[in-house]
Design a protein with these regions (language model features):
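Catalytic-domain carbohydrate-binding cleft regions of carbohydrate-active enzymes
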Residues: 1-242, 246-247
Length: 248
């Protein structure tokens, strides 16, 4: 862990974890009908066939919020279709209300939604009304939205398992004929339906990005305004929502 040293062959910790994951999923499948889901802290080449993992011990910062999306999209391309991150950050300072709100808003549209922290950092959902009263109603709204998206996530999970299409993926995956998507590091596609342009800077009042999909009509999920794909757009941003677009 933490890449402090290169392990010797007599200490193949990651390979051991891989064998444990494989054994566990085989045992579950032999005793239980239906889908099985395993979360593992360690992994090795081929883990995507048996278990899922997360981005690791991130810190409570805007930079972590920004780059977790890049990591998750890359993990999706590697077959880890249910990857997630510790929303709010695992270690470091307690996230302020705006950072936690933005992280939750973004996390709703990731495969694995988990608010998790270390020791005395109070980010647990049952504490938000006390620890983050300023944005509690907005946090509550997005937590409810995540619940409403469960059927969609189940559908996309099945599709990803059967066809290998990542749930969370870079925009270039879907729009390879549009050069503007080649350098889109932070915007991403979430399943068949959503395009997400997350907010990863404090006190953000506007967001400019390329909306892919020439010939596609996108609908802003919250304002219901329609936009044509294949163009650069700029939106005014408030604290109540983030740029999320849907297509039919």
């Amino acid at each position: 862990e933490y890449c402090r040293e290169t392990p010797a062959t007599r200490r193949p910790h990651q390979a051991q974890g891989h064998e444990m994951e494989m054994s566990l999923i085989m045992a579950k499948l032999s005793h239980e009908a239906g889908a099985s889901w395993i979360l593992s802290r360690s992994g090795y080449s081929g883990i995507q066939k048996y278990a899922q993992t997360w981005t690791g011990d991130n810190n409570s910062s805007w930079k972590s919020l920004q780059y977790d999306n890049t990591i998750l999209a890359s993990m999706g391309l590697s077959g880890l279709i249910h990857a997630g991150c510790d929303i709010g950050g695992f270690w470091g300072e307690t996230p302020d209300s705006e950072l936690l709100l933005r992280w939750i808003q973004n996390g709703v549209f990731t495969p694995r939604f988990c608010i998790h922290s270390y020791k005395d950092i109070p980010t647990e959902p049952d504490l938000h009304e006390v620890t983050h009263p300023k944005h509690f109603k907005s946090i509550q709204k997005f937590m409810q939205l995540r619940t409403e998206l469960i059927p969609y996530l189940e559908e996309q999970s099945k599709l990803a398992s059967e066809q290998g299409i990542p749930i969370m993926r870079p925009t270039v995956y879907d729009f390879q004929d549009e050069p503007e998507t080649y350098n889109q590091s932070f915007e991403y596609i979430f399943g068949d339906k959503f395009f997400i342009a997350p907010i990863y800077q404090p006190e953000c009042t506007s967001r400019e990005f390329y909306l892919p999909g020439k010939g596609i009509t996108w609908t802003h999920y919250f304002t219901k305004e329609e936009y044509q794909g294949g163009q650069q757009i700029s939106l005014d941003i408030g604290l109540e929502d983030i740029p999320v677009f849907t297509r039919d």
